[in-house]
């Protein structure tokens, strides 16, 4: 699994506190560690890649949704961007999410929060109400609808 060292450093640095100084370190699991490549288009992701799941011989399900199939993506004339979700077909747990397109580095954070703070399931994002028209609808729609199982 890829790790963004700057994000790891910020995420495990001293814990901020109110009132008195504390130097406790945050640590923990890095499965929900996001990464981003600031190229054109942007690339961002969190969790496992499809290749990692295939190599580990894990069953998984995928769903891909194009930016162009949302109102904002269409208004931006975005024809190439997409979101791909990897999930456990039995539990619905989010195994990974990968985004290629404008603002990918910002859009991925909804998935990071769901994986780290929520139940970590597809339903955490699918069941949340999203603003229309907004670009993050592409993330919502990628988590909604029919997933395709892979063995």
What are these regions (language model features)?
Residues 1-31, 92, 134:
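Rossmann-like dinucleotide/flavin-binding elements
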Residues 21, 38-151:
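Flexible, glycine-rich terminal cap/loop adjacent to redox cofactors
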Residues 32-37:
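Helix-loop-beta segment of a Rossmann-like dinucleotide-binding subdomain
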């Amino acid at each position: 699994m890829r790790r963004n060292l700057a994000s790891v450093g910020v995420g495990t640095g001293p814990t901020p506190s109110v009132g008195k100084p504390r130097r406790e370190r945050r640590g923990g699991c890095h499965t929900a560690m996001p990464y981003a490549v600031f190229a054109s288009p942007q690339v961002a992701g969190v969790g496992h890649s499809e290749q990692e799941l295939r190599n580990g011989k894990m069953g998984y399900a995928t769903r891909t949704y194009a930016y162009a199939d949302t109102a904002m993506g269409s208004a931006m004339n975005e024809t190439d961007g997409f979101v791909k979700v990897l999930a456990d077909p039995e539990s619905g747990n989010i195994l990974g999410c990968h985004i290629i397109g404008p603002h990918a580095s910002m859009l991925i954070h909804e998935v990071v929060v769901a994986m780290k703070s929520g139940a970590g399931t597809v339903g955490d994002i699918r069941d949340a109400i999203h603003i229309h028209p907004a670009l993050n609808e592409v993330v919502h729609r990628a988590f909604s609808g029919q997933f395709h199982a892979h063995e």
